[in-house]
Amino acid sequence: MSTHDATRARFAATADRLAALQERRAEELASRIREFVPLTGEERALDAGAGTGALAFALAPLVREVVAVELVPELIERGRAKAPPNVTFVEGNIEKLDFARASFDLAGTLRTLHHVPRPELVIAELTRVTRPGGTVLVADQIAPNDPLAAGELNTFERTRDPTHTRTLADVDLRQLFEANSLVLLRAEFVREQRELEPYLDLAGCEGEQREQAKALAPRDYTAELGWYLLEKR
């Protein structure tokens, strides 16, 4: 089974759980977007790896149009069912976006990079489809700077969810931004307490796999999310 097929199967099986989590987080996410991203209301925005539309829905009241790209049909179906009029869902691969250069004023991705085999391609694609002077938004969990701690974290996450590839450290993300000549405008870091049992449920982690993940889980698991706002020059 290919990586993309595995991702489709995993998220198809847990689509309802992901949609419910999005609804619980919606108000908090909308508030963060309003505070973190300066917008005029005239932007055409991209949500790459949209899931059921968390980022797209947070952006929708603040921009002219949002295109939400997602690989998994079941997530698209749930997103479309609740999408506001200015949000359009399309099926696609965020490592190879089907848009012309400079198609968007803002291109963003939320909690996706740790699920893709080559995150450098995602950052390159976000940059490519953003117009000069436009902004790129990246938000994802970041790994500890200590390589041993990062390795242990990634081992746990892959055991919990085999579609997890690698959580990148802040320094790794900044190198990807620099490689694409993106200028960092703002960065913030948010700590997120994770209760183990619901976190395993979210991934559909069951049986022997669940027991293995529980044995590897960090004690009092607190994840760190990095939020990055960048300009394409």
Question: Each predicted region: which residue ranges?
Answer:
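Class I SAM-dependent methyltransferase SAM/SAH-binding core
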Residues: L46-A48, T52-K96
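A conserved beta-strand element that flanks and buttresses the S-adenosyl-L-methionine
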Residues: G108
